[in-house]
Each structure stands twice: as C-alpha cells, then as structure tokens.
Amino acid sequence: MESQRNILLIGLLFVSFLLWQQWQADKAPKPVATESSLVANVASTHSADVPEADTGVPAAVAASKNLITVKTDQLDVQINPVGGDIVFAALVSHKMEQGKEQPFVLLEQTKDYTYIAQSGLIGRDGIDSSANGRAAFTTSATEFTLAEGQDTLEVPLTYVADNGVTYTKVFVFHRGKFNVDVDYKINNTSAAPLQVQMYGQIKQTIKPSESSMMMPTYRGGAFSTNDVRYEKYNFDDMAKSNLNQATLGGWAAMLQHYFVSAWVPPATDSNTIFSSVSAGGLANIGFRGAVYDIAPGASQEISSQFYVGPKDQAALSAISETLNLVVDYGFLWWLAVPIHWLLMFYQSFVGNWGVAIILITLTVRGLLFPLTKAQYTSMAKMRNLQPKLADLKERFGDDRQKMGQAMMELYKKEKVNPMGGCLPIILQMPIFIALYWVLLESFELRHAPFMLWIHDLSVQDPYYILPLLMGVSMFIMQKMQPIAPTMDPMQVKMMQWMPVIFTVFFLWFPSGLVLYWLVGNIVAIIQQKIIYAGLEKKGLK
C-alpha cells in the first residue's frame, strides 16, 4: 500500500517536473550565438556559390511597386522579380490572432527582420551565382489571382541572358494547398554548352524582433537525408558548423511553433543539404541540386517544391514521406501518433476539439479500467494485511532480512502482489506525456475553442478555472482513499499537498491538457465509487 503511494507520488511529481521544465524551456527565448562567432563562420567552401541576401531591405523590395503579388485561397505571396525570391507569405486561412482578420504572416522582409525563400541557378553558367549577381526577371503582369473554378495558377518569370539564352522560372500554385512548384525551363539557343545547378534556401534572421517571435517553441532549422530521416539543426548548430550532406532527395526546412517552410527537391535527384550563417546575422539552410549540362540547341527543365504553411501532417506526407516528422512528438512519438489520429477521428464527428479530448479521456480510462480495478483490489487487500504486517514488524524488529522474507511469504500465502496497483499508474504516465506533446505540436488545436471561457485549447486557461477544478478533483480523490495507519506522517503530509502542487503546476499548462486531466479525475472518482462498492460486498475495504 505504502509502496504504491510512494510510486504514485514520485511518478506524478517527476513527470510534472519534466513537463514543467519542458514548458518553461519552450516559452523561453532560445540562446543564440554572438555576432562575432556568426561572422567568423561566414566563410564556407561548399556554399560560396550560393548568393547572400542583404540584411536590410533591398532597393527592389523597398520600392514595393516592383513586387509580384499572388493570391490564392490559401496564400498571399509577394515575389521579388530580382532573383524570383518569395519575400512575403501570409496564410489566408490562419489568423495572426484569434478573433482578428489579419492572416498569419510566415515569410516577410522588413528593416529589422528577414525570413524569405530564395531559389535560383548557380554553377559555371548560373544566372544567380555570386559572381554574376541575381537575374532580373520580367513578367507579363504584377498581380496574379487564383480565380473561381481554377485549380492551379501559374506565375511565369522570364530572363534573357546576354548570350541569348532564355530562362523561364515558373511558380505553380494549387487550390487548397500550401506547396508551390518552382520550375526552371532553360532553352539554350547559344552556340556553347551550359552548365547550371538549381538551389533553394531559406534565410531567417537569427535575432528576430519581438513582434516576429510569435510562437514560444523551437525555432530553427531541420533537414532530412538518406542517412538521417529527421534532425533539428538550430541556429547555434549553424553558427558552429555548416551542413554539407549529400543525399538522394531529402529536404531542408525552417521550423517554428505550428508552422514550417521547406524546400523539397525531387526524391530521385542527387542533392546536397547545406547551411551557413551570413555576416549580417542570417541563418541559411537549403539544398543544391544536381549539375545539368545543356547542349547548344537543347532544353532542360529543373523542378523543386516549396512548402510554406502549417504543420499539417497529411499535407506534409504528400510532399515527402519524412516531412511530416517536423511535427515532433519526442521520444513517445509511437504513442502520440495514434493519439493524434484518434483525436482527429473524434473531432471529425463532434466538431469540437474539447469534446474530442473528453472522448480521448473516456477511451483511455475505459481501456485501463480492468487494470484500475485490479489496482484498487490490490490496494484493498494490502489494507487488510496491515494488521498482519504490523505483527511481523513487531516480531522481527530491526532484522530487515527476516522481515522481508516473512513479508514475501505472507504476500504469497494471501495471493497479494504489493506492486499490483502500480501498473495503471505506470501506463498513464506515457499517455499523459504523449498527449502533452500532441496538444503542444498539433496545429489543429491552435485557436481551437471548447466552450464558455475556453477559446483556445492550446494555451493556458485565462482565468485558471480548469486548474482549480482539477485541484479540487484531486483533493476529492485523495479523501476517498483510506490512509494506512502504518504510513509515515511525512508521506501523509506530502500526499495532502499533492493537489496544491499539481494545481500550481497546471496553471500554465495548455487548457486542453488540463481538461484531459480534470475529466480523467472525474471518471476516476466515479470508477472508485463503483469499484469500492463491489469490494465492500466481498468484504474488502
């Protein structure tokens, strides 16, 4: 009985402490390298041919009249004709703040902050190489809109080099999607062979202004190769060492809470995933594709995809089989994935994420009910053994070895497993942690309302009502469980403080997580009533 209480106390406090630490770490600003260390790492032999971006606003961007605007049902994008870079991207269906109409801005380039997506052609005859500068494209219009009944929207940019070669860069937008096809069509009308190589990179200010730091969790790079399915590569990593990994396919991305931007070259192409840090304090991560030799009179098409949007696992998986891993559930991903699937399944029927969380809770408690019943039965048997255990303690005194042997014989004789009540507790801990990560990482819960005062299940309860109710429910559960007379007084006091400690812990947890714990406690109270009634009929109290 006492050992079960000890495990419950230690387990709950340990898990809560871990989650509290993680929550605080997520909310705290990420440490960044000093500017001197960043500048020291600028030199890079493997990315020197990839053009750098200005730290401020380029003249072409400042004179916003020159920007090409693209509007679809999901994206509001601005493209700089110099280089054909995406310098602004707003997500139409996702709002900056709940209740406001302003769309969420993911990519932007301002005086103090840069987060853009570049792509171009480098190599010996590259029109975007550092030596030659960036290509200045022309286009037939400066505004493009996806019309009703139109599934795709093409935005063609054209550049004619001095040698007469025509380069066409085409952005293809799709209805209902956040991925953009970026295609190059090269028509070599010159008398000499051409050698080019496509690249795509994402540039972001390492020290973004406060207004740009919209989300509290991980912000930094990530990549995937043949050898590494998924790995985060934060700004400190980039400052210390440049990536230079050859792979077939792969992708490179910048992550932040709920949102991601990623370059995804064709899975069958040989690519190099690279990173660097520029002297202006910009972190760069991207890919360099295969080198293409284009004979005189020949044509060549080179393609890639760019994703800029929410961490939608279905959409990301459709682009690359590993891109959905940017939804990072931690070491319990194998448990979090089915929980997320079940959460989505329930929500598709009830249309309310809070109700879906309640259904998840009922499902978990229902599955664990046989174990919960075994737990309380074991605890009741242990309580009935307390007089006999007290006799053993009096008989053997300080002889721990004989005392232990006698206790084991007594347990065997009475068919009692002293650890039998711990299994439900042990099983609930990973479920709790996995659900924590699901609620923290799943973009679907961003701005998802429940009812009454809970307007966003992904953030803390603004009035702390749920944590207080959760504390009350824990207090009721505690009062329902008899305390063994042999229990140490210090342990009794610690158990009495548990509801208070947990209430304080949960004040800043996502309200969806607190809702799960509160409903779980209510169900547990009902289960206790039912189980105890059955045990009393059997003479077990």
Curated annotation (Swiss-Prot):
Pfam families: 60KD_IMP, YidC_periplas. Its main location: membrane. The chain crosses the membrane at residues 6-26, 325-345, 349-369, 420-440, 457-477, 500-520. One of its GO terms (biological process) is protein insertion into membrane. It is a multi-pass membrane protein. The keyword Transmembrane applies. It is found in: Cell inner membrane. It comes from the Bacteria. GO terms for cellular component: plasma membrane. Keywords: Cell inner membrane, Cell membrane, Chaperone, Membrane, Protein transport, Transmembrane, Transmembrane helix, Transport. Required for the insertion and/or proper folding and/or complex formation of integral membrane proteins into the membrane. Involved in integration of membrane proteins that insert both dependently and independently of the Sec translocase complex, as well as at least some lipoproteins. Aids folding of multispanning membrane proteins. Interacts with the Sec translocase complex via SecD. Specifically interacts with transmembrane segments of nascent integral membrane proteins during membrane integration. Belongs to the OXA1/ALB3/YidC family. Type 1 subfamily. This is Membrane protein insertase YidC. The lineage of its organism: Bacteria, Pseudomonadati, Pseudomonadota, Gammaproteobacteria, Alteromonadales. The gene is yidC.
